Amino acid sequence: MSRQIPFSYQCSRCGRCCADMRIQVNPYEVCRLARRLGLTTTHFLARHTVSGVHLATRPDRVCGFLSSAGCAVHPDRPLVCRLYPLARHVTTSGRERFACLLPRPGSPGEFGTAGSVEDYLAANGAEPFLAEADAWLALFGRVHSLFQALLADHSLLAALASDIRLELLQDRPPPASPLLDTDRFAGEHCAALGRVL
């Protein structure tokens, strides 16, 4: 569905959408969450993520930021949390569409048609998160294209990449990306230039 489709959702803040979910974060979300908690991105990634990629959950598989009062980081919650119960899909050509997810079992939230998807995005402060997610996706797409071109020219590299992919599929968390740790990345870059951050 498009942004113009009639849609509304009244969240009851029951917290059911905060359980049994794997929330992947991008650098913008890491920065927002780290600042909300008064941490550097380095400390945030170490304390609150799994391999610097997904938000950590408690042993009961509930988001570590869910408290009895609700989401402890609500003003800076990730895009996927802002969109719920919508999912957003963007094609490689940049075409955007939304899908409505099935409600979590027992969720008392109410669906309706009082507004539009666009209204829902605005009410949840999604626009800066959407822009940053698109920029992150574009960077990933560019890196992927360059990597594919490199592999096409080097059969040994292609075989190695295949082995690495198989290794990553062995039910292990993915390796942490230094790009997600913007504080460390910026600090190392400034140090290399002989500048103080």
At which residue positions do the language-model features occur?
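Short loop/turn segments that flank or connect secondary-structure elements
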Residues: 1-197
